[in-house]
Amino acid sequence: MESILTELFQRHRDAEGMLAKLATAVGRVRREGVSGAGVLDDLGDLRREIQGEVLSHFREEEQALFPVLGRHIDSASGPIAMLMEEHAIFRQLELQFEEAVAALEAGLKDGWEEKVCDAGEAIAGMLPEHIEKEESVLFPMAEGMLGEEEWDDVRRLWKEALAAVLPT
């Protein structure tokens, strides 16, 4: 298997671990509210994990794998377009989660606990199916269609995507 795909599969396993933590945190907010010991800290940690891991994973797919695979399949429709749309939906949910966590950290009460739970549950409901689509459709498609020179292009674009966000 191509090393980039191995990396993407590992990122999916990491995201699944994050989803377990998210489910635990949402459950605690529902049971204890944010006044429970460590609840706000856990939500802040999750916010950073989502920002760091999941969104960087999307960026690497969108800026490295999708453009090269798009040479073979129409990126305006089909699996690439569908996955890009799901990435956009996830980003909106992630923003709602961040907004709610920030409001709770600022001590606001009016419905923010419910909003953080709703956003967390929506993320948890969407991401597993998204991962399945990538692993069962997109990644096998890429493995079957891309030649070695194209994988070189994916690796180069991947490095550029990483370099664009890493501090110098």
PLM region spans:
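Small-residue-biased structural context
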Residues: 1-168
